[in-house]
């Protein structure tokens, strides 16, 4: 990682392969170091959940050019926590982003 540019950590609840995260990362990688740690697949509705007892898998991916991409078997919260503890190893990101979301963010009040 080249820390002469801003460091941005991205996660989401739609997974590391989602169109939204790829679009956001591709745009930001022109002027920042981008690290992605997102779930292996869609975890909609799990944004505030975390894994208390499950063993988590962390896998490095290469699906987005000019970005360091990791997938995690856990929730979005697990992804950000693991990114801080294992991937960034003490380096503090300048910005942490979530998204771009696929679909609407609706709660029970809207259903």
Residue ranges of predicted features:
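A short glycine/serine-rich beta->alpha loop
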Residues: 66-69, 102-107
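Short, glycine-rich nucleotide/cofactor-binding loops
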Residues: 10-17, 105
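A cross-family phosphate/adenosyl-ligand binding-site feature
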Residues: 2-4, 8, 19-92
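Short beta-strand segments
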Residues: 11, 37-39, 98-101
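Glycine/small-residue-rich loop that forms an oxyanion/phosphate-binding "nest" at active or ligand-binding sites
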Residues: 78, 93-95, 99-104
């Amino acid at each position: 990682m080249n820390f002469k540019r801003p460091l941005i950590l991205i996660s989401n609840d739609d997974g590391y392969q989602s169109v939204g995260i790829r679009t956001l990362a591709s745009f930001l990688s022109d002027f920042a170091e981008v690290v992605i740690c997102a779930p292996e697949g869609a975890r909609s509705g799990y944004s505030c959940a975390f894994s208390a007892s499950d063993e988590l898998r962390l896998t490095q991916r290469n699906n987005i050019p000019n970005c360091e991409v990791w997938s995690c078997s856990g929730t979005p919260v697990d992804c950000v926590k693991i990114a801080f503890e294992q991937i960034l190893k003490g380096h503090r990101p300048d910005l942490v982003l979530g998204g771009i979301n696929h679909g609407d963010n609706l709660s029970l009040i809207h259903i």
